[in-house]
Amino acid sequence: MSQFPEVLDNNLLHAENNETAEYIQNDGTNQSEVFMEHPYTPNMHPINMPSIVEGAVHPYNNLIHHNDAIPPAKYASMRQMTEDFWREKKQKMTEISEEDMLNKSKNMSVPMARVKKIMRIDDDVRNFMIASDAPIFMAQAAEFFIEEMTAMGWQYVSEARRRILQKADIASAVQKSDQFDFLIDFLPPKTVPTTSTNGPGHMSEDSFQDPNMHSDFHQRTSNSSVNRSHHN
């Protein structure tokens, strides 16, 4: 029909594949946009995506390959990560100014009241005075302690090519270091993931079970029954 072009806006031109629309602005400049029928998902393959007109601005070009791949571990080993961690912390504490130190002491991540309470748990310490800067030193040491264990957990996750940090990762990473032997009694035992009903790849805290739990239980029960028989 001859009146059909008059119905359309003169500033809008539709492409033949209905995937691009080129806007001709009043000043004569052109701007192209791509309209996607389906939103981007991490598992979308480029061959399944709509065709892209050459020269058009595509907002997802930089996400197709970079968002899917899990980056490799930054450090080759846990020891290298730990050495770099403490080198950075030492340099940071050496270069800190007095003003920053005062501000840091007033805004500690670890509660100062909790630190003072822990420092007075020992009966031998209750009879002595604690200097005002001692809790600040202990609070900063506690922050470094937490940061190091977290960094070790992330290194363990990166080596396993995963994205989510779980408490089992921190426990596994800490158990590899001799300097954390005093935490063995507080760390959960090494566990194996089990299948969850929430979907593939999903692992909750309840899905971790100790493979030796049942054998240890039966061994303890059998030993207790033997001891009762001897007493009888």
Swiss-Prot record:
The protein's name in its UniProt record: Nuclear transcription factor Y subunit nfyc-1
Keywords: Cytoplasm, DNA-binding, Nucleus, Repressor, Transcription, Transcription regulation
Organismal lineage: Eukaryota, Metazoa, Ecdysozoa, Nematoda, Chromadorea
Phenotype upon gene inactivation: RNAi-mediated knockdown results in ectopic expression of the homeobox protein egl-5 in the head region. RNAi-mediated knockdown results in ectopic expression of tbx-2 in the gut and seam cells of L4 stage larvae and adults.
Purpose of the protein: Component of sequence-specific heterotrimeric transcription factor (nfya-1-NF-Y and nfya-2-NF-Y) complexes which specifically recognize a 5'-CCAAT-3' box motif found in the promoters of its target genes to regulate their expression and control cellular identity in particular tissue types. In association with the components in the NF-Y complexes, represses the expression of the T-box transcription factor tbx-2 throughout larval development, which most likely restricts its expression to certain tissues.
UniProt source species: Caenorhabditis elegans
Span list, region Disordered: 191-232
Tissues showing expression: Expressed in certain parts of the gonads with high expression in fertilized oocytes in the uterus and mature oocytes from the distal to the proximal arm of the gonad, but weak expression in the syncytial ovaries and immature oocytes at the beginning of the proximal arm of the gonad. Expressed in the excretory cell, secretory cells in the pharyngeal terminal bulb wall, in the small ganglia surrounding the pharynx and in the neurons running anteriorly to the sensory organs in the head. Not expressed in the intestine, the hypodermis or body wall muscle surrounding the pseudocoelomic space.
Feature: compositional bias, Polar residues: 220-232
InterPro entries: CBFA_NFYB_domain (IPR003958), Histone-fold (IPR009072), Transcr_DNA_Rep_Reg (IPR050568)
Primary location recorded for the protein, binned into one broad class: nucleus
Family, as annotated: Belongs to the NFYC/HAP5 subunit family.
Quaternary state and interactors: Forms two NF-Y heterotrimeric transcription factor complexes: the nfya-1-NF-Y complex is composed of nfya-1, nfyb-1 and nfyc-1, and the nfya-2-NF-Y complex is composed of nfya-2, nfyb-1 and nfyc-1. Interacts with nfyb-1; the interaction is direct and is required for the interaction with either nfya-1 or nfya-2, and subsequent binding of the complex to the 5'-CCAAT-3' box motif in DNA.
